[in-house]
Regions:
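Non-heme Fe(II)/2-oxoglutarate
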Residues: 1-80, 97
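Catalytic core of non-heme Fe(II) oxygenases with the double-stranded beta-helix
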Residues: 83-155
């Protein structure tokens, strides 16, 4: 019997070379504000300051410079042109989280793990379809570390 993998959810990851040399600089350029927007859950973000206003954050150019080798690889993976529309940062205190959401129905989104200690889990993704045998929701937590970036279909709930 042959197995056919009819649908695949491609997630790409890359480790930023020499991340430890750049981490503090990136963090120093961030200006996060505490929010309890919609959920009452507290976390820190610059989403409403930059993304919602259509402004690029102070750290964007530096991050783009560091990610240039990653974008060169993406050019080889994707057979279509792409643009980077926006960038924002978020920080979660112990026990903090963000409500389940996606980033729209088209394209890819990314998470750069600027700071990730061993006590925090990376982003948890939820399958766009349920387990076929039991009907359960399936989840995936990528094996990433500080300085890694992952690219995922924007439609994926996380």
């Amino acid at each position: 019997m042959e197995l056919h993998r009819a649908f695949v959810v491609p997630i790409f990851s890359h480790s930023v070379e020499g991340w430890g040399d750049h981490k503090e600089e990136i963090i120093s350029l961030m200006d996060l504000e505490k929010t309890d927007h919609r959920t009452g859950r507290n976390y820190y973000t610059d989403y409403y300051k930059y993304h919602k206003q259509g402004i690029r954050p102070k750290y964007a150019d530096r991050v783009f410079d560091l990610l240039e080798p990653v974008f060169d690889e993406l050019d080889q993976v994707f057979d279509v042109s792409y643009t980077l529309d926006s960038m924002w940062a978020q920080n979660y205190p112990k026990g903090g989280c963000h409500e389940l959401h996606n980033h729209g129905g088209l394209g890819y989104s990314a998470v750069l793990y600027v700071q990730l200690d061993e006590t925090h889990l990376p982003t948890k993704f939820f399958s766009p379809f349920n387990d076929f045998w039991h009907g359960n929701l399936m989840e995936y937590i990528p094996n990433v570390k500080e300085g890694d970036i992952i690219f995922f279909p924007s439609v994926l709930a996380h």
